[in-house]
Amino acid sequence: LMKDYLDSKSLPLYDMLSYHLGIHGLDPGLTVPKRNLGILLQTAVKALGGNPSLTLPAAMSIEMLNAFCEIHDDVQSGNPTRNGQDSLWWVWGPAQAINAGDGMHSIARLSILNIDRNHFSDNTAHGAVSFLDQGALVTFEGRYRDLEMQERIDTTVEAYLDMAGQKTGSLYGSALSIAAKLSGHDEKVCEKIFQSGHFIGQARQIKLDITQIWGSESDQRIDFLNKKKLFPVVAVLENATPSQKRKLGDVYFKRVLEDSDLDSVLEVLDDLEGKKLATQQYVTAKNTAFSILKENLPDHSSEHLIDSLETILEE
């Protein structure tokens, strides 16, 4: 569906969108990135008794919104690569990348409004758009908090979890609540399911942070090099000695970080069991999200969704 839409446009702007999505211009040696949010939405529709063949525009919508966030994130972070190839801004420059990202956002809203009105009422369509916009706005709030934390060493676990739930979890909440709305569930259930995304986001972000620090790929460390506060660091700060806090401060207050600075951080994390603390919080967040789904959905529906989310979170 995304390919058909973008191929129907002649302006080179849409070639940029195709490039970012891996539809055209992808190195033959690379694989197209998984559309986790779109797949999750469709999986949820099926699990909740809806018809996935009718909700493809909504799946396209959530993927376009995610792409919008990715493009802007790459510009903000100065990330030169995305999914194994040069990032969009690295090829076309930040100004055109911002145009492309904003275009993705507009397409996301138009796509969900184009769902078949022979099967969905105006009220249902507008409700789905509302959950899309709600997810976008909360994501922006989380990204604001994330950037604000970069120059601070006194970030709390509570503040981090709020940020991660907003920044990373809101689109998962949107995907699930849109699926519930399009499957005929009432507003209260949809709102509860949206809230589960907050904890999915916490778990997902903590997992990514663990990979940033202990993963083997140096190109995965862009967030560390940009001084973003990763959860293991935030978790150990609460019990760190003054000398350990100074050691971390010496790293994070440097003008420019290098890969070698991670060694100093790892010493403190190893002493204070940072990886263990992060793993425990990951499990807590994941279980909280799953409990919300179990409490608000029939057993067969929640079990199917939880299996899908387990797969996404463990990637």
Residue ranges and their predicted role:
Residues L1-A67, I71, V75-W90, D146-M149, ...:
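Conserved N-terminal diphosphate/IPP-binding helix and adjacent helical/loop segment
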Residues K3-D15, P28-R35, I98-N99, N118-W214:
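All-alpha helical catalytic cores of prenyl diphosphate-utilizing isoprenoid enzymes
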Residues P28-R35, P52-S53, G165, Q220-K227, ...:
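Structural motif
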Residues Q42, A59-S61, F68, G101, ...:
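Small-residue hotspots
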Residues P52-L54, H119-N123, E187, A240-L248, ...:
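Structural helix-adjacent loops and short alpha-helical linkers that scaffold large soluble proteins
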Residues I71-V91, M104, R109, L113, ...:
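Acidic, Mg2+-coordinating active-site segments of isoprenoid diphosphate-utilizing enzymes
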Residues H126, S130, E191-F194, G249, ...:
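Short, charged, amphipathic alpha-helical segments
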Residues E267-E315:
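C-terminal charged capping/lid subdomain of soluble metabolic enzymes
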